[in-house]
Amino acid sequence: MKPKLNDVAKLAGVSATTVSRVINNHGYLSSQTKEKVFAAMRELHYQPNNMARSLQGKNTRLIGVIFSDISNPFFGELVSRIEKILFAKNYKVILCNSADDPQKERDYLQMLMANQVDGIIAGAHNLGIEEYQQYGLPIISFDRYLSDNIPIVSSDNYQGGWLATQTLHQAGATNVAIFTGKSHAGSPTNGRREGYEAYLTAQQLTPHVHELPFELTPALKMMEIKTIMTQHQYDGIFCSDDLAALLVLNVAQQLSLTVPEQLRVVGYDGTALIRDYHSELTTVEQPLADISTLLVSLLLQRIEDANCTLESKYTLPVKLIKGFTA
């Protein structure tokens, strides 16, 4: 028997009115109340009745966009590009910032379903979000596996890691480290690390991997970087994102290391912010314009025809942006 709103209310221990307010994101409700309602909806596999309007073929022209941290220049620019393309096609965006919190991502996904979005672009990196596999909604993923029937768009992270390391080596570095995020299944930085390690192995050089937790504040991350750079005399450092590379350059200045004579540095992402304000940084550029265009194009194809044939993965090439740090 299909669950009803009253069933959700009973299981969550709240009124039917409260469930309705949570579904429609109306008025103030405590996070504890929202979590009880969303948990009950998940347990019962409850779909709000207003989803029927979408099932009747009436689109809402709303697209959900879920990313992990839009304060990061890379995600900020990507979301901006996605929104601009969708707006030009008469779609509006509901933006969700999951902050690398799996439960927050689940709640946002439930909210998007309740608000009858026509499709979702998912770019957070939490694992085990089974809700993506439970709904028949059009979804396109950026940079991570969600389920067998959800296409993935990404740049060539392995080639990017190889290219960055090759650039450092050809600039004269022989003791090359990588500063990267914590390794976990499905993380895009894994490919960058693998490319780094493969190049050094091919050159019979030793990899030096240092993982910097994503949740560290810039100040704490810089302290960690300074400790590492004080203990090790690296002449080349590859950072799996540009923000970490800027911290490395800051620490190098504190330690009186000249760049690129004593230390060569390569970052990763190559956003407009880096190109405009930190052109000194050599970095691997992800093709944000192409990524955003492809994400939207694939999603709209799936919205227009749920049975259209799409590839399981689309990998776009990266390129080196030459500064003077390597």
Swiss-Prot record:
Gene3D superfamilies xrefs: 3.40.50.2300, lambda repressor-like DNA-binding domains
InterPro entries registered for this protein in UniProt: HTH_LacI (IPR000843), LacI/GalR-like_sensor (IPR046335), Lambda_DNA-bd_dom_sf (IPR010982), Peripla_BP_I (IPR028082)
GO molecular function: DNA-binding transcription factor activity; transcription cis-regulatory region binding
SMART domains recorded: HTH_LACI (SM00354)
DNA-binding annotation, residue ranges on this chain: 5-24
Database matches in CDD domains: HTH_LacI, PBP1_Qymf-like
UniProt keywords, alphabetically: DNA-binding, Repressor, Transcription, Transcription regulation
Domain HTH lacI-type: 1-57
Entry function: Negative regulator of scrB expression.
PANTHER family, per the entry: LACI-RELATED TRANSCRIPTIONAL REPRESSOR, RIBOSE OPERON REPRESSOR
Protein name stated in the entry: Sucrose operon repressor
Lineage of the organism: Bacteria, Bacillati, Bacillota, Bacilli, Lactobacillales
